[in-house]
């Protein structure tokens, strides 16, 4: 369900889809595993359990939730998801942050000297330097990121155990009606995690070179959407076949185009854009 170019690609595709129901990557993930994946002869999708499907649906508007049946009910009734889904939610967020630290350092967009002022990174940096003063910088960074992840996981497990005991949760229904998430970091670690997020937003995501890449991503996604909406016959056969039942339905066409673009990798999207716009490229 994640578009090429991450959040910038998602925002661009959502803008393109405004007249056709919009685009939410969590809904697209659910659509992929329920409908788009073709692995079985007797049914579409992957036949995943309810709990897995609910965990995929991290965010959802009330309008869309009403169309999803049981899996969307918690957004309407304002109940909590299962513990599995709560774990997945925080695991995804932590994985993104730590990956972006590693990626930002390797790309040179952020520097170790800056990150040392961020508590979550700085504490692990000091410990790694104390234990392994002579290791290469690239190995040191990997070790710091690994320790950051371990630090977060240990705190999450220990604090969540306390939350579950305090809530007296003994069943799925207890979890759903707890009134709050029962999986979470302790307040000090949560504050450290938020500090890292703020740093990444200010120093990495708004870096001028990242902003340039974001703009390129928006152009590629928007151009691809426009080309295929103007002439859906340029879609690959497996996508074009889905339009034969309603060839004049613009909304159906837009959804198929969005499915195609959302399934692309960054590299594939750039290559497809080049094939469609560069006269020297083979189509």
Question: Where do the language-model regions lie?
Answer:
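Aspartate-rich (DDxxD/NDxxD/DxxxD) Mg2+/diphosphate-binding motifs
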Residues: 1-19, 26
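Generic structural signal for short, solvent-exposed loop/turn connectors between secondary structure elements
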Residues: 19-20, 70
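Histidine-centered, transition-metal-coordinating active-site segments
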Residues: 27, 32-41, 45-283
């Amino acid at each position: 369900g994640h578009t090429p170019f991450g959040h910038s690609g998602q925002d661009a595709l959502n803008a393109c889809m405004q007249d056709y129901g919009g685009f939410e990557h969590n809904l697209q993930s659910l659509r992929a595993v329920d409908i788009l994946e073709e692995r079985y002869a007797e049914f579409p999708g992957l036949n995943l359990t309810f709990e897995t499907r609910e965990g995929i649906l991290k965010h959802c508007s009330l309008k869309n939730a009403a169309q999803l049946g049981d899996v969307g009910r918690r957004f309407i009734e304002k109940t909590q998801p299962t513990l599995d889904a709560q774990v997945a939610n925080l695991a995804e967020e932590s994985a993104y942050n730590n990956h972006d630290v590693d990626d930002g350092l390797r790309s040179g967009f952020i520097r170790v000297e800056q990150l040392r002022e961020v508590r979550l990174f700085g504490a692990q940096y000091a410990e790694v330097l104390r234990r392994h003063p002579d290791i290469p910088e690239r190995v040191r960074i990997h070790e710091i990121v690994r320790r950051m992840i371990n630090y977060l996981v240990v705190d999450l497990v220990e604090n969540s155990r306390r939350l579950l005991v305090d809530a007296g949760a003994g069943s799925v229904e207890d979890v759903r009606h707890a009134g709050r998430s029962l999986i979470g970091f302790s307040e000090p670690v949560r504050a450290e995690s938020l500090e890292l997020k703020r740093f990444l937003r200010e120093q990495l995501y708004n870096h001028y070179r990242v902003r340039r890449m974001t703009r390129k991503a928006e152009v590629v996604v928007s151009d691809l959407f426009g080309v295929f909406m103007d002439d859906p016959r340029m879609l690959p056969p497996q996508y074009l076949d889905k339009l034969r039942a309603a060839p004049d339905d613009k909304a159906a066409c837009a959804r198929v185009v969005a499915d195609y673009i959302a399934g692309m990798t960054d590299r594939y999207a750039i290559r497809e854009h080049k094939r469609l716009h560069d006269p020297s490229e083979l189509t």
